[in-house]
UniProtKB/Swiss-Prot annotation:
Protein purpose: This protein is one of the two subunits of integration host factor, a specific DNA-binding protein that functions in genetic recombination as well as in transcriptional and translational control.
Record GO biological process: DNA recombination; regulation of DNA-templated transcription; regulation of translation
Family: Belongs to the bacterial histone-like protein family.
Single Gene Ontology MF annotation: structural constituent of chromatin
UniProt-recorded name of the protein: Integration host factor subunit beta
Gene3D superfamilies: IHF-like DNA-binding proteins
Gene: ihfB
Subunit description: Heterodimer of an alpha and a beta chain.
Species lineage: Bacteria, Pseudomonadati, Pseudomonadota, Alphaproteobacteria, Hyphomicrobiales
Keywords linked to the UniProt accession: DNA recombination, DNA-binding, Transcription, Transcription regulation, Translation regulation
Length: 102
């Protein structure tokens, strides 16, 4: 699902809202999540999951084409950890037991 499909689905479930208003709301939510992560904050949506930033240290990499060793700078990457309710629902809907993983 892409963002435009998400907006369309939300608008269909909420006929009292215009699609452009739903799009503005979705964009505002996503922008606030990005802004919080850029500040170094963690964003937790209870039952859904938590967004955070992980820092990867500098390391020595290798160019796969030439085999040459190249330095890779440290970087920050977004990280998402699913919430308990989401994990349980995904496992239940897929016929997998949450306790055993099978």
């Amino acid at each position: 699902m892409i963002k435009s499909e998400l907006v369309q689905r939300i608008a269909e479930h909420n006929p009292h809202l215009y699609q452009r208003d739903v799009e503005n709301i979705v964009n505002a939510i996503l922008e606030e999540i990005v802004a919080a992560l850029a500040r170094g904050d963690r964003v937790e949506l209870r039952g859904f999951g938590a967004f955070s930033v992980k820092h990867r240290p500098a390391r020595a990499g290798r160019n796969p084409r030439t085999g040459e060793h190249v330095p890779v700078e440290q970087k920050s990457v977004p990280f998402f950890k699913t919430g308990k309710e989401m994990r349980e629902r995904l496992n239940r809907d897929n016929g997998i037991s949450a306790e055993t993983g099978a």
